[in-house]
Structure formats: structure tokens, C-alpha cells
């Protein structure tokens, strides 16, 4: 069975829209105005050891690019990006660490969007919902975490759209997605 690599799919416009819709709907349900100066929007991305970046990975660039698109879709000009690192390993990780970033925010509330995750897991349910919430509340911030829209029907549609070129034997460049490094 031939193996095809599909990378860069976070750039698919329908995926970007469905994630922005989830943030917008969550904020509306919580009565939060994302443009309010007392609200800080934080995109929390999975961290990576910096030696991968030094070796040529552009992961941090892709995270920044994706967050910029999300902010634009939301009509928000100010936001922060933090990384969930595994600092129990004695190597340098991407910065800033989200747990260092959040307590320093100049806001009354923080809305955290876990941008690197497609489903709920320990890194969202424990690291964000429990540990980061404790850090935020200790700093006097109301904490809100956007649920991952893993059950949104549009995710399956996006994935099908991305896989179809490979199955139909036409150029995967059809989507004009650049390969990630």
C-alpha cells in the first residue's frame, strides 16, 4: 500500500473557519466579548523541543500563522500564543510556556483556545482545565477554555476533502497547501 503524506492541512480554509466558529460560539454562550480589553485571548499550542526548530522545523511559524488566521477570522487584533511544554525533560522548549504567560496577563478574564489539538485528552482536560485554570484563578483571572469541536461534522468533511485528491489520483497540490517541515 503506497503511503502519502498529507501535511499543512491546518491551512484548509474550512478547517480554519470551523475552529473560529467554535471560539465565536463559545464566547457568545459565555457572554464574552473577545474584543473587550479586559479579555485576553490565548492560543495554547503543543510545545516542541527547540532543537527541532534549530534543525529546520518550522512548527513555531505554522503555529503563529494559524493563530494569526484565527484572530483575523474572529476580528481580534490582540492575542497571545503560549506553548504547553514538557519541562520535565531537561532540554529547551518553545517559549513562552502558557503557564508562565497566563498569570502575567493584564486582563480580567482569559479565553484559552487549544489550537494544536483535534480531540480532548490529558493535555486539554488536565493541563488546561485543571492546572492552567488554577494558575489563572490564583492570578485573579476568570478562566474560560474553548472546547475542541471534535464532534463538528465539518471536520469529517475537511478530512474527506483533503484525502480525495490522493484517492482520485489527481494532484494533491489542488488545495494549494504547502508541506510542513
Residue spans for each PLM region:
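Extended amphipathic ligand-handling, pore-lining, and cofactor/metal-binding catalytic surfaces
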Residues: 1-181
Amino acid at each position: 500500500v503506497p503511503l502519502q503524506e498529507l501535511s499543512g492541512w491546518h491551512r484548509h480554509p474550512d478547517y480554519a473557519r470551523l475552529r473560529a466558529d467554535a471560539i465565536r460560539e463559545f464566547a457568545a454562550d459565555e457572554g464574552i466579548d473577545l474584543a473587550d480589553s479586559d479579555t485576553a485571548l490565548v492560543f495554547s499550542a503543543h510545545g516542541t523541543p527547540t532543537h527541532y526548530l534549530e534543525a529546520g522545523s518550522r512548527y513555531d511559524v505554522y503555529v503563529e500563522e494559524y493563530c494569526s488566521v484565527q484572530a483575523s477570522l474572529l476580528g481580534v487584533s490582540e492575542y497571545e500564543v503560549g506553548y504547553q511544554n514538557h519541562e520535565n525533560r531537561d532540554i529547551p522548549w518553545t517559549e513562552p510556556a502558557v503557564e508562565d504567560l497566563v498569570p502575567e496577563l493584564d486582563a480580567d478574564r482569559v479565553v484559552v483556545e487549544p489550537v494544536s489539538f483535534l480531540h480532548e485528552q490529558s493535555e486539554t482536560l488536565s493541563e488546561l482545565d485543571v492546572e492552567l485554570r488554577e494558575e489563572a484563578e490564583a492570578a485573579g483571572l476568570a478562566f474560560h477554555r474553548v472546547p475542541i469541536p471534535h464532534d463538528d461534522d465539518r471536520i469529517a468533511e475537511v478530512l474527506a476533502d483533503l484525502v480525495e485528491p490522493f484517492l482520485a489520483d489527481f494532484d494533491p497540490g489542488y488545495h494549494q497547501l504547502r508541506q510542513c517541515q
